[in-house]
């Protein structure tokens, strides 16, 4: 715990409490009431008023600290909630995107045109292959280069003009030793001009022997920018950091340049950048079908003044319903406030009974002031409690809204990838043979790589299914769905 202006806050909250207007407003108002209670307690003692205010004052102090700490924690949670979702979605969208690339490399490394070009290295065939790769890249727009190399590291052909000699990149040796598996690297690569490149590579095989290496260079800058633009709001910073806590990319190179080391703990809620305190949330990638990506995490940051600027404001009252929505701690705050008020009412009532036989105008005035201060205290606690619950409700609403919007975006991106798949596969030479065995084997291999599909079918011009990747029971069946005619039109 750390103390800020006489109030104890949890260590994660204390550095940010000064930036929370709602917390500061209630703290000042409650501090003024506390001073009033101290004065009234002293006057009650000096006037011999039979009213012991020590218990009420102690309860008031305890609940003040509890209320302000709770309000600060929920205000921070309201700010960090969306940031945490932004960071989680950013790294998960990137991870899912890269998972699709592992399927691409598995498919392309066995492409007949690529295998053939590795074997004979005929210039005309390599030129034709380059156009083949350009067609692929035009459909799958996530690559900035595709490079085919011989086992000796020589660049045979590539998507864009560039390094054309013999590469000494470590990715080649790793891919050649991969025995049919892909490798993923993020390192400076000579065939990418010695710049950092996120590459998926796999060896190209012919009759069980290595004929070359295919490398897909992911357009990280473009794809990360698309993610950042979709998720980051004004003046927010989104960044990917590696396993060593160094920034890979961010949407604000001035505040978080590539290569900068993040020294804050992974669970830290605050981070200072350029002399400005930021609220921060960090999220690691969640595995997708066992794939966790290159081991990166995402950071989302917002200046504290911006993050806490809106708050719940004048939000309407929140009903105390739904135990699964509000924590017991939150629900206890107004209950404890009402209990303090009941004790205060009893104390004032007893004091009035005691003074009924006396004519002390001062004592009667003092009791009236105690009662009025009690009402102001009750009002302040109710307002703070209402704002506290409205803060939580606003956070839940914002969370639901953000997740709903991004769920639609993720689904749309997934379907976009599926449209790319079908356009590319429709031109595959193995499928064009219409040989049931060849087509079935090809579809099964594709479905093993692109696991999002429940089944893959090839049907002839009459709509009769020739082969299926998984459900052989549909083979020979004639499809009568309206989309069949649309595909054949």
Task: Please report, for each region that a protein language model flagged, where it lies by residue.
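Extracytoplasmic/periplasmic ligand-binding sensor regions of membrane-associated signaling proteins
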Residues: 130-131, 135-225, 270-281, 432, ...
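Juxtamembrane extracytoplasmic/periplasmic/luminal helical "stalk" adjacent to the first N-terminal
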Residues: 1-120, 310-434, 452
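Sensor-regulatory modules in signal-transduction proteins
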Residues: 204-206, 285-290
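Solvent-exposed, extracytoplasmic
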Residues: 126-140, 213-267, 304-330, 436-452, ...
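Long, ordered, amphipathic alpha-helical scaffolds
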Residues: 258-261, 276-285, 299
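PAS (Per-ARNT-Sim) sensory domains
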Residues: 213, 297-298
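Short, positively charged
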Residues: 78-86, 120-131, 177-183, 213-222, ...
């Amino acid at each position: 715990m750390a103390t800020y202006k006489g109030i104890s806050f949890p260590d994660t909250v204390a550095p940010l409490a000064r930036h929370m207007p709602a917390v500061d407003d209630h703290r000042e108002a409650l501090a003024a009431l506390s001073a009033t209670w101290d004065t009234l307690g002293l006057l009650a003692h000096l006037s011999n008023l039979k009213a012991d205010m020590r218990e009420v004052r102690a309860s008031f102090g305890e609940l003040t600290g509890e209320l302000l700490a709770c309000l600060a924690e929920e205000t921070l949670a309201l700010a960090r909630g969306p940031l945490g979702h932004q960071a989680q979605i950013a790294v998960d969208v990137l991870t899912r995107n890269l998972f699709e690339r592992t399927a691409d490399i598995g498919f392309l490394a066995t492409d007949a045109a690529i295998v053939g070009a590795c074997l004979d290295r005929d210039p005309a065939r390599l030129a034709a292959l380059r156009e083949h790769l350009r067609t692929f890249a035009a459909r799958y727009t996530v690559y900035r280069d595709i490079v085919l190399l011989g086992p000796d590291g020589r660049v045979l052909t590539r998507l864009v003009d560039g390094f054309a000699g013999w590469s000494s990149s470590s990715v080649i040796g790793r891919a050649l030793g991969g025995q049919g598996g892909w490798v993923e690297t993020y390192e400076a690569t000579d065939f990418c001009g010695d710049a950092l490149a996120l590459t998926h590579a796999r060896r190209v095989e012919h009759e069980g022997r290595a004929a070359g290496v295919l490398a897909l260079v992911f357009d990280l800058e473009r794809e990360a920018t698309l993610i950042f633009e979709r998720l980051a709001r004004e003046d927010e910073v989104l960044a990917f950091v590696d396993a060593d806590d160094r920034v890979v990319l961010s949407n604000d190179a001035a505040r978080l340049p590539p290569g900068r080391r993040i020294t804050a703990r992974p669970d830290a809620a605050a981070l200072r950048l350029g002399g400005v305190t930021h609220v921060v949330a960090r999220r690691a990638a969640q595995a997708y079908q066992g794939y966790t990506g290159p081991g990166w995490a995402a950071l989302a940051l917002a200046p504290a003044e911006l993050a806490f600027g809106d708050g719940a404001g004048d939000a309407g009252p929140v009903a105390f319903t739904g135990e699964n929505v509000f924590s017991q701690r939150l629900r206890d705050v107004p209950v404890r406030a009402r209990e303090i008020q009941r004790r205060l009412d009893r104390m004032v009532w007893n004091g009035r009974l005691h003074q009924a036989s006396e004519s002390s105008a001062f004592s009667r005035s003092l009791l009236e002031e105690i009662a009025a201060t009690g009402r102001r205290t009750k009002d302040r606690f109710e307002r703070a409690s209402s704002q506290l619950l409205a803060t939580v409700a606003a956070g839940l609403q914002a969370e639901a809204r953000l997740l709903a919007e991004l769920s639609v975006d993720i689904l749309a991106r997934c379907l976009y990838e599926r449209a790319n798949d079908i356009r590319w596969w429709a031109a595959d030479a193995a499928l064009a043979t219409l040989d049931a065995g060849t087509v079935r084997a090809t579809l099964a291999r594709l479905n093993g790589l692109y696991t999002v599909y429940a089944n893959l079918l090839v049907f002839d011009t009459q709509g009769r299914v020739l082969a299926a990747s998984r459900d052989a029971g549909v083979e020979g069946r004639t499809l009568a769905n309206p989309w069949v005619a649309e595909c054949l039109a």
